[in-house]
Design a protein with these regions (language model features):
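Short amphipathic alpha-helical interface patches used for protein-protein assembly/oligomerization
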Residues: 24-28
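Anion-binding and metal-coordination hotspots
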Residues: 7-20, 30-388
Length: 388
């Protein structure tokens, strides 16, 4: 949570900040005569606590929000983002032979008659060759086997995880924050994430039942819509991606057609349009707070369970921020720091005014008697006389 509010992503950075800040020492109950925990201690404590404990912390914060009427839970939105893993692409090896990527490229060069290439020649050959594909079925990272080869939004390829938020569209509270493999399609994880959100609402004793679920067109899949329509109480509001041809339902179950058409009608309605506007605003805001200013865009841990633990606490810290904004009108990452800076600036301004006043009226060398305004003095005297 300190990492979220201070905008620090690494364990070493968090440990250093706890050691350096007097206010954080006071908050954590660490006297100046004692050393604060180092990054190794933080890692050991996190590893010893199971992920269920971290989920209990998350639901405990949800319970606090519910006490302040900050959890509605009826209308939610779902979206995902990629978290860059703590592993480089050069750490990948083939699953079948165990060869690293450089040796694999050298074998391709040998087939074309190029022997004993230098590292620069290998890099140039790999950059120029056509149909270059690296799949998770054939390659795995030795540094973090659970990280997936993922194409990022900027077109680059990295080892990554996928973080998915389920957000209350009425209060901006995160109801679930789940970590999945980076190569999982959005439609694969939609129902699981919403079910996690409902479980969290139940464990937080909110009494809320999720009814409406909004997502972007990346979540649209016929099979997923059909499954959710058949065995869940959720109504989906998911726009359809543009297709080159009209959908054909010949030979397909009637349930699929009914589910797709019902979702289409809801999306085109006024409520559907409003939910899409709210989704693009509220869900993206949670990612901006947690991943960008909160320091969670790149994970410094390895293994899905460790990443899940850290991300649950970051999402819980975001929800504490929602509560703080309700109570104190501040609660974003670095928000308290800005408040302190503003307070210090105001105090400094008051101090400068005090010094100026002191020099003007107390210091004899700078004392300058002001001329008497007789008309103003006479008017003041007349007003006192009239009052008497």
């Amino acid at each position: 949570m300190i990492g979220y509010f201070e905008g620090i992503g690494s364990q070493r950075g968090i440990a250093w900040r706890c050691s350096d800040s007097l206010s954080l020492r006071e908050f954590l109950g660490i006297p100046l005569t004692e050393d604060s925990p180092d990054h190794s201690t933080l890692s050991v404590v996190r590893d010893r606590l199971p992920v269920e404990i971290h989920r209990e912390v998350f639901t405990w914060v949800l319970r606090l929000l519910n006490e302040k009427k900050l959890v509605k839970g009826k209308t939610v939105a779902v979206d995902s983002t990629a978290l860059e893993a703590n592993a480089a692409m050069k750490s990948i090896v083939r699953r079948d032979t165990g060869d690293d990527y450089e040796n694999y490229v050298k074998q391709l060069m040998a087939k074309e008659g190029i022997k004993d290439p230098s590292s620069e020649e290998v890099r140039r050959f790999d950059k120029q060759r056509q149909d270059k594909k690296v799949s998770n079925e054939e390659w795995v990272s030795e540094s973090d086997p659970e990280a997936s080869i993922t194409k990022m939004k900027d077109g680059t390829t990295h080892l990554a995880y996928k973080a998915e938020h389920v957000v209350d569209l009425e209060t901006n509270a995160i109801l679930a924050a789940e970590i999945y493999a980076g190569d999982h399609a959005d439609s694969q994880t939609l129902e699981d994430s919403v079910n996690h959100a409902q479980t969290n609402l139940n464990e937080a004793e909110t009494g809320a039942e999720i009814q409406d679920v909004a997502a972007d067109k990346g979540y649209h899949a016929t099979e997923q819509l059909t499954a959710m329509a058949e065995h869940t109480p959720y109504r989906t509001y998911i726009p359809e991606p543009e297709l080159k041809h009209n959908r054909r339902w010949t030979g397909k179950p009637a349930e699929q057609k009914d589910a797709v058409y019902a979702n289409r009608r809801r999306v085109k309605g006024e409520r559907g349009k409003q939910m899409q506007r709210q989704r693009s605003e509220y869900v993206e805001r949670t990612f901006a707070h947690v991943c960008e200013t909160g320091g969670a865009r790149r994970t410094w841990l390895r293994g899905m369970e460790k990443v899940q633990k850290r991300y649950l606490l970051a999402a819980a810290a975001h929800n504490i921020g929602v509560l703080m904004r309700k109570l104190f009108q501040m609660g974003t990452p670095r928000g308290l720091q800005k408040y302190v800076d503003d307070l210090w600036g105001s105090a400094r301004a008051v101090y400068l005014v005090f010094l100026a006043t002191w020099h003007q009226f107390v210091t004899p060398t700078t004392f300058r008697p002001q001329p008497i305004n007789r008309q103003k003095s006479l008017a003041t005297a007349n007003s006192f006389t009239a009052a008497a």
